[in-house]
Amino acid sequence: MNRPRPVEKMVGIIKKLPGVGHKMAERLSYHILKMPQVEVDRLIDSIQNARRTMKCCSICCNLSEHDPCPICSDVTREKNIVCVVETPQDLIAVSKVEDYKGLYFVLGGALSPLDAVGPDDIRIDKLIKRLKRDSINEVIIATDADSKGEITAVYLADIIKILGIKVTRLGYGLPVGGDIEYADEITISRAIAGRKEM
């Protein structure tokens, strides 16, 4: 027996979420259908509210309710160092490390020639404009330790070095092929401390 069309549509939409396969989408769909209506309404409201209120910070491109975001607005942070990450989730992971007091920049992805993601598809131009505008002495490249992250790191390092800015890469306390957002604070802290100039 086939699933009812509304459920099939729901499964199709949910499985578009990252890390959600067909079976998980099916489980989530049926779970949502069993939830009390008040909980479903809360879920819908929270999604709509987040979509409505979250903005992209005009300085670092992090998601925030405010522009500029609280990190960019924090006068106690070191303004001459920028940590470049792929996603807002990576920024959150790195920001849990108390050792790092600088600023951030969220690329919005990583270069991936196989997926046709080039420099124009992520915020490299915006990063370079910021580096030229602000008095930045060092850029820490904190892209993932996978092939896409490495390609992105090398590409960025080549461009940023031309500007006369020191470029470092997180030390390899992070596992190769791993995502920064899943690393614990101690690992990220050691990676920041062990960063190397590129």
From Swiss-Prot:
Claim: DNA repair is one of the keywords in the record: yes
GO process annotations (BP): DNA recombination; DNA repair
ZnF (C4-type) intervals: 57-72
Keyword Translocase: no
Sequence ranges assigned to domain Toprim in this UniProt record: 80-175
HAMAP family linked: RecR
Stated family: Belongs to the RecR family.
Protein role: May play a role in DNA repair. It seems to be involved in an RecBC-independent recombinational process of DNA repair. It may act with RecF and RecO.
This protein's name: Recombination protein RecR
Species, as recorded: Endomicrobium trichonymphae
Classification lineage: Bacteria, Pseudomonadati, Elusimicrobiota, Endomicrobiia, Endomicrobiales
